[in-house]
């Protein structure tokens, strides 16, 4: 097998590495740099990538930066002239450039790659990344999470006992925290959390806003309306941010930034580290919530963490390092280069795939729960978040009405108990179900998440063997804001969600009890005295009335009343059957009055009835 390169496809910068012997090595670009700006420019019909594209961004409006922030957004396009490009196409141009100079370095064609993504990337974003690789002519052997890759780079040569490692990964546009267990060549992810819209770009923007406000107050001119001025400000802000990682104050000088009535205007200002920390403190504090959540989901406290690894260029910011040190109660490990660790780890995984690296097992997790909508609009989870992947889970569901010929499988991703509060990943239909009473057909729904975190769902009618499958497409994924909203709302609305769930459960129980009671009344007709049957009929009508009036308190009261008299009826029927069969062996035990005739694990499905005549 040919070399498998490892690519860190970053928001602001990308890197590539390859395994040489037993060691991963960064491949430098044609300019000799170890990282490449994730910038694409269109100029005179030519596509420029990397440093050359970044250098002329001030004068060329057809320059695209930070495209990674839009991966997985089906409606996002970049217009250049009369053509519109998807984020996958722009990302593919960066990957093509990396592929080319990697081939020049290796002296052989490169076809296979491992590409990294933020741990909190959803299914749509992962699919989009894989698609970008395909467009670039790469066979993407594996998609792995960035914190996991950096842990691979950190732990490759470690011979110590088991370690619990927390990876704090703050890049140019995304943020992740992962907790891993390392030992005996096994890299097991225990939990992951993050914010796919937080990174170094946001720190730059804080400086830009400060410069714009200051210039406006002093000169009465709003630089934010001048595209060329804003590009100069962005370059200056990025440089100032980097300078302040090493010095306590930096001077920002932008001559001829604008012009007023008196002539040219210049921007000259000093930015201290203290002021920068003040401007960006809210961004640093935003990383605390995922930090805490990752520990909580792993079932650990800070005292259980043996090492803290910083990854991503933005972790060079002193305030970030100090915050992590304070939260973790220990000095972060600085043994790996935060700009290069992810690519090095991806190259190690490439070596595992090619067979050059032995005795390493990578066990990653899925960041969000997956399931389907069931009766009453409930979100029934099949795979919980932070489940080790690859994984597969099946559950039996059934029909909601008699003689239902088809079921609609509504696939969802999120953490809320009600389907409407989660994100639709896709829908598909299983048809030609033979006519049968509700609850009888056995529909097996299977979720499968592959090693790349990409989701496949199938539904199979166990009676006929007919099966329908769907691979969730990138257009149906979640946005980063939606992921954060799901997690936040799941905590804020826990009480409200519990009440909704309780109401739906009650309605489902009432519906099921009415159905079962009517079935029982047909079975006992003529077998018991009317005086035994009438109380059940009366209680049944009372419950139906409460159901029709939508009175929840009445429904609960009448449900309990019907359950009691129905149980009494079942006892009398059992006693009569016993008397009729005295002396006969092999008497069967009583049936579960709540059974619907299907598997005990069967869950009523919220499926759409399909008219076969249409």
Curated annotation (Swiss-Prot):
The modification Phosphothreonine is found at residue 174. Keywords: ATP-binding, Chaperone, Nucleotide-binding, Phosphoprotein, Stress response. Pfam families: HSP70. Acts as a chaperone. NCBIfam families: PRK00290.1 (NF001413), prok_dnaK (TIGR02350). PANTHER family: HEAT SHOCK PROTEIN 70KDA. Belongs to the heat shock protein 70 family. This is Chaperone protein DnaK.
């Amino acid at each position: 097998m040919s070399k498998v390169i490892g690519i860190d496809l970053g928001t602001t910068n990308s890197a590539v590495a390859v395994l040489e012997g037993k060691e991963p090595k960064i491949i430098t670009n044609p300019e000799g740099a170890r990282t490449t700006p994730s910038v694409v420019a269109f100029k005179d019909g030519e596509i420029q990538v990397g440093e050359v594209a970044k250098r002329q961004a001030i004068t060329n409006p057809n320059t695209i930066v930070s495209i990674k922030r839009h991966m997985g957004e089906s409606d996002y396009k970049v217009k250049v002239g009369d053509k519109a490009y998807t984020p996958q196409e722009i990302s593919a141009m960066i990957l093509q450039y990396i592929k080319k100079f990697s081939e020049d370095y290796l002296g052989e064609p490169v076809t296979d790659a491992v590409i990294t993504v933020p741990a909190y990337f959803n299914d749509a974003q992962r699919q989009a990344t894989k698609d970008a690789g395909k467009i670039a002519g790469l066979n993407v052997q594996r998609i792995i999470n960035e914190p996991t890759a950096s842990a691979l780079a950190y732990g490759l040569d470690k011979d110590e006992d088991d370690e619990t490692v927390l990876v704090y990964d703050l890049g140019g546009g995304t943020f992740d925290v992962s907790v891993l267990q390392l030992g005996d060549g096994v890299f097991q992810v225990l939990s992951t959390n993050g914010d796919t819209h937080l990174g170094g770009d946001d720190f730059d923007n804080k400086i830009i806003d400060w410069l714009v406000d200051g210039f406006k107050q002093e000169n009465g001119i709003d630089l934010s309306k001048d595209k060329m001025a804003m590009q100069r400000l962005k370059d200056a802000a990025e440089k100032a941010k980097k300078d302040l990682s090493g010095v306590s104050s930096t001077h920002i000088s932008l001559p001829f930034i604008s012009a007023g009535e008196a002539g040219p205007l210049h921007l000259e200002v000093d930015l201290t580290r203290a002021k920068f920390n003040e401007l960006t403190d809210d961004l640093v504090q935003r990383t605390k919530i995922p930090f805490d959540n990752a520990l909580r989901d792993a079932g650990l406290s800070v005292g259980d963490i043996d090492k803290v690894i910083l990854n991503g260029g933005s972790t060079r910011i002193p305030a970030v390092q100090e915050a992590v040190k304070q939260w973790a109660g220990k000095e972060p490990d600085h043994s790996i280069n935060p700009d290069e660790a992810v690519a090095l780890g991806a190259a190690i995984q490439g070596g595992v795939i090619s067979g050059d690296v032995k005795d390493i097992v990578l066990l990653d997790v899925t960041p969000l729960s997956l399931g389907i909508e069931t009766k009453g609009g409930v979100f029934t989870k099949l795979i919980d978040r932070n489940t080790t992947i690859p994984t597969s889970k099946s559950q039996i569901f059934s029909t909601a009405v008699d003689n239902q010929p088809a079921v609609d499988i509504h696939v969802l991703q999120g953490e809320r108990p009600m389907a409407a509060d989660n994100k639709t990943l896709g829908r598909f239909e299983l048809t030609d179900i033979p006519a049968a009473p509700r609850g009888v057909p056995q529909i097996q729904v299977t979720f499968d998440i592959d090693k790349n975190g990409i989701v496949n769902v199938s539904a199979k009618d166990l009676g006929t063997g007919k099966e329908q499958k769907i691979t969730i497409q990138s257009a149906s994924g979640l946005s980063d804001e939606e992921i954060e909203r799901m997690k936040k709302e799941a905590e804020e609305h826990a009480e409200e969600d519990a009440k909704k769930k309780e109401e739906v459960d009650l309605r489902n129980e009432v519906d099921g009890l009415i159905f079962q009671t009517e079935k029982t009344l047909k079975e006992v007709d003529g077998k018991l005295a009317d005086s035994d049957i009438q109380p059940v009929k009366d209680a049944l009508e009372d419950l139906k009335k409460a159901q029709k009036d939508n009175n929840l308190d009445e429904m609960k009261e009448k449900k309990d009343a019907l359950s009691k008299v129905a149980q009494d009826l079942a006892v009398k029927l059992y006693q009569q059957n016993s008397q009729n069969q005295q002396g006969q062996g092999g008497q069967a035990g009583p049936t579960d009055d709540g059974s619907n005739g299907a598997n005990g694990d069967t869950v009523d499905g919220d499926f759409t009835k399909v008219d076969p005549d249409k």
